[in-house]
UniProtKB/Swiss-Prot annotation:
Gene behind this protein: tolB
Signal sequence range: 1-26
GO terms, biological process: cell division; protein import
Subcellular location: Periplasm
Official protein name in the record: Tol-Pal system protein TolB
Organism: Paraburkholderia phytofirmans (strain DSM 17436 / LMG 22146 / PsJN)
Keyword flag Nuclease: no
Alphabetized InterPro entries for the sequence: 6-blade_b-propeller_TolB-like, PD40, Tol-Pal_TolB, TolB_N
PANTHER family: PROTEIN TOLB, PROTEIN TOLB HOMOLOG
Length: 430
């Protein structure tokens, strides 16, 4: 069986594991392991007036911080504290909190909601600022995620990814659904529903579009789906298989895997479907392309050495220079994804008959396994490079999971009674 057939069958079988009736609701269940004393203690008070709000903003903030694995929540009691209230920072420090958050949620005359908050450093006894966020009711959860991102940035020194989105595929009642949700799996909505499989969703760099492969016409075709409008464009409908779309960092080009010439090869195509050009040359199976963050290189899976391994070539194709092998740990490595800073490579390695998520330092080439599961697939880096989202199985059921790049923090995103696969973590919101 060819490499492309193996990879394709594994993807399709995984996404067809369980068919269920009724609605599927994503719920993030968090297991934080191995962090210990490295967690930052923070107290987030209930926000003033949020009891009358359709969303409990402070609760969402606490949940975001907890699931990051970098914070531990100190009990702030049930009394609401507004951002304008006087705060005894010494008392909160005595309770073990190194930071304190207060805020309010108010409905404006025009029906929108205003979230205000203030962050304090209790150790230094000073304010670390805050924000005023205005949104419609439907945007309140995202406002809460932005509060958590602000806190993360101020206390951790890097950008948070709470206000980002996920895409994934759920099969329910004989239909496949491409769903878009918040980073915690909540506020999910269906972008596409089809009786045929949907695979390989990939976010555009600006977060407004998702490319994917749909079998709705009884063959794999690559589409670009504009999320705000719902408009779709066919990017590749060539003879044979059209698969594995990957965006260039500038959003102008996609790399795709096509079998139009026989064996699957990697091509580049403009985002409007024009300008198709072949990038890999030869008789091997080349698939699963992924651009480097600077857009100068493409990583991909190839069996040119006999077994699937990950290679790197110029984004201009092999005519600009022969591809170089990247992975040397293990005899079967697939599904490359490069971290946003270009320093790490996530991929799936076959280990003892199972498939596990690995991460490799691209400078030192050291490879490390990150999971204890054996059905891992489809890795996707968070926009800040601190976490990797992937699909796996727990108790025989397809779930999504996220793990920190040091392997210490793990999260599981499961669908009650159903199976969820094909994850992709979206970029920072514009």
């Amino acid at each position: 069986m060819s490499l492309m057939t193996k990879l394709g069958l594994r993807t399709l079988v995984a996404s067809c594991l369980i068919a269920v009736g009724g609605a599927a609701h994503a719920q993030l269940n968090v297991l934080v392991t191995g962090v210990g004393s490295t967690q930052f203690p923070i107290a987030t008070a209930n926000f003033a007036n949020e009891a009358n709000s359709p969303q409990q903003v402070s609760t969402i903030v606490r949940q975001d911080l907890q699931r990051s694995g970098k914070f531990t929540n100190i009990d702030a009691g049930s009394t609401p504290v507004a951002e304008t209230d006087s705060v005894d920072l010494g008392s909160w420090k005595a309770k073990g909190a190194n930071a304190f958050v207060s805020g309010s949620v108010n409905r404006l005359p025009n029906g929108q909601y205003e979230v205000r908050f203030k962050l304090y450093d209790t150790v230094k006894g000073e304010s670390l600022g805050g924000l005023v966020l205005v949104s419609p009711e439907s945007g309140l959860r995202m406002s809460a995620h932005k509060v958590a991102d602000y806190i993360y940035a101020k206390l951790m020194g890097g950008r948070g990814v709470f206000a980002t989105r996920l895409s994934y595929v759920i099969k329910t009642g004989g239909r496949y659904q491409l769903q878009i949700s918040d980073s915690d799996g909540q506020d999910a909505h269906i972008a596409l529903s089809s009786p045929e499989p949907i695979i390989s969703p990939a976010w555009s760099p600006d977060g407004t579009k998702v490319a994917y492969v749909s079998f709705e016409k009884k063959k794999p075709i690559v589409y670009i789906h504009d999320l705000p409008t719902g408009r779709r464009v066919v990017v590749s409908d060539q003879k044979g298989n059209n698969s594995a779309p990957a965006w260039s960092p500038d959003g102008r080009t996609l790399a795709v895997a096509l079998s139009r010439t026989g064996n699957t090869q990697i091509f580049a195509v403009n985002a409007d479907g024009s300008g198709l050009r072949r990038l890999t040359q030869g008789s091997s199976i080349d698939t699963e392309p992924c651009f480097s963050p600077d857009g100068q290189s493409i990583y991909f899976t190839s069996d040119r050495g006999g077994q699937p391994q990950i290679y790197k070539m110029s984004a201009q194709g092999e005519n600009a220079g022969a591809a170089q092998r990247v992975t040397f740990t293990g005899s079967y490595n697939t599904s490359p994804r490069v971290s946003p800073d270009g320093k790490q490579l996530a991929y799936i390695s076959r280990v003892g008959g199972g498939f596990k998520l690995y991460i490799q330092d691209l400078q030192g080439n050291t490879a490390t396994g990150l999971t204890d599961t054996t059905h891992d697939e489809s890795p996707s880096f968070a926009a800040n490079g601190q976490y990797i989202l992937y699909a796996t199985q727990v108790n025989g059921r397809g779930v999504l999971a996220a793990v920190s790049t040091d392997g210490r923090t793990r999260q599981v995103l499961s669908v009650q009674g159903g199976s969820v696969r094909e994850p992709s973590w979206g970029p920072f919101m514009q």
